[in-house]
């Protein structure tokens, strides 16, 4: 079962996780916990008069953060008693030292795997692309030192050389890469001359392209995320080489009952095409399989360039 309910409100509670499992999900990614959720602001109730000012200031500036995942750990412990599908925890931190501490607590709570939901917007003019990538590698290395469960990284699509970076992450110990993370995007309201943020929409074809280009070329699993609307989209991703397919927007729109429809659609397609398991057709249309028809990478590049020109000429 390749269908994973991705990190969202549907997976933030034991009841929500159980509903996903009952609906047929192969796994769930718990709603991400963010470091900012646990920042202590203002007065700590009934604490000021009993605590030393330095201790109180310590708590306000992050001292409690090391113990912040307590609620999500409790959710994991309770959910493990209710469902038998893998529970993938998701964390998003800003402070480098907190990634491994959060990860260790979540691992000890019984999570089956961990997804690092890394989001750093490169605003600094002095930060190079390699600096940006190195921050990811540092986080991964520190987390892997603390946990024994599989660790995946959910990547943004805006990486200069994704194949190279993907392999470096795999070499550093990433067990899987999730393509892609769809962040909030800015918009401008022209009448009020104000800015607002809108949720980024998953682009199925962008994920499909990079799944196909990376599958079986980098030494870790590849999973997709974003844009799934029907069972054909699931089949496409597996043909491209995806080991699992994350989705959530579809379930918001049509309900968790849509998971059964997706599974039935995939099974019907497999029956029609005489496949007995997803492994039988996984990656059949990946780049590495099609590359066999090319003499070298240069010839492959020429092929993709020719396809681009052929398609572009239709609109000329």
Q: What are the roles of these predicted feature ranges?
A:
Residues 242, 249, 266-270:
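Short leucine-rich amphipathic alpha-helical surface patches
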Residues 10-11, 252:
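Short, glycine-/Ser/Thr-/acidic-enriched flexible segments
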Residues 8, 14-47, 70-88, 92-224, ...:
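Alpha/beta enzyme core
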Residues 254-257, 261-273, 279-316:
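C-terminal extensions of enzymes
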Residues 44-62:
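Active-site gating loops and adjacent loop-to-helix segments of metal-dependent hydrolytic enzymes
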Residues 246-250, 254:
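Helical hairpin unit composed of two closely spaced alpha helices linked by a short loop
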Residues 1-4, 59-62, 150-151:
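Short, basic, glycine/proline-bearing loop/turn elements
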